[in-house]
Amino acid sequence: MSRRIRRRSGIGLGAGPLALVGAMAVSGVIHLVRPAVFERAVPRAMPGSARGWVLVSGVAELACAATTLWPPTRAVGGLASAALMAGVFPANVQMTLDARRPRTRAITLLRLPLQIPLVLWGLQAARSTPR
């Protein structure tokens, strides 16, 4: 399946890294359009406003998606994407701890191990840079 996507997309990304780019682009837009959804995820120990952190992280996700997608910047974009996905892990833990409803807690808890493939896909994208 990865090869089909590579040929069809023409951008040289496998299915995993391409999924990472799509997820980061969608998430980045949601961060900017509906920041209140993410504000409670910002750990209380972070300085400044939660809204500010959410907006900055949305811009960072969009920048990572774009630089990972574009072959000349893919190595840096993939590494930045992996670092960002590792860096937001504390916010995802905070969302799980703050979840009030059992269903919300279950969803946020199940999301935690998904950070691992996201980090790995960022690293994979960085390694797939055309030489």
Where are these regions (language model features)?
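Short amphipathic, positively biased membrane-proximal segments
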Residues: 1-131
